[in-house]
Amino acid sequence: MNRFAKLLEKLMFTPSRNAKIVAMAEYFENTPDPDRGFALGAITRDLSLNNLKPTQLRTLTKSRVDPELFDMSYDYVGDMAETISLIWPKHTNHILEKQRLPQLGELISALQTKSKIALQTYVTELLDCASVTERWAIIKMVTGGLRVGVSARLAKTSLAEFSSKDLTEIEKIWHCLLYTSDAADES
């Protein structure tokens, strides 16, 4: 999850098209399956996940921090994921701090299978043991708001770069790609 969060941060704040292609190609090269496929699906917004509504996240956060502080922070920052990731209290339980975040595939599987109530509890536990960047990525994933400045065409270009395949070959099979945990389980 940490590597994926860093990739999202890089993609979000890198204006250069070529630098984004290199960042994605490096991620794909250094990430095992099925996580690289899930990352591709998440970046291109082709994943279907159970989402938390912004009001649910707002309520969840206000149960952890002063509601007025949250409202003022959100008003100032303007982005809910960024506000929550910055304002979420650092957990004082050292056991939670050392708790491992799930791999991207594990996170996606949980997001696809958990009920709305179980999802809220799960997200709370994740946010408690995550860094600021990881919290931001988790919130973007659970709200379905993963817009990081990457089009499907740019993702295809990075795949061509990573795989040393021609872009037209990638485009020919693109419509056949399936980003579900079922597909990962079959391999």
What are these regions, as identified by a protein language model?
Residues D182-S187:
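A short, hydrophobic C-terminal helix/tail in secreted or cell-surface proteins
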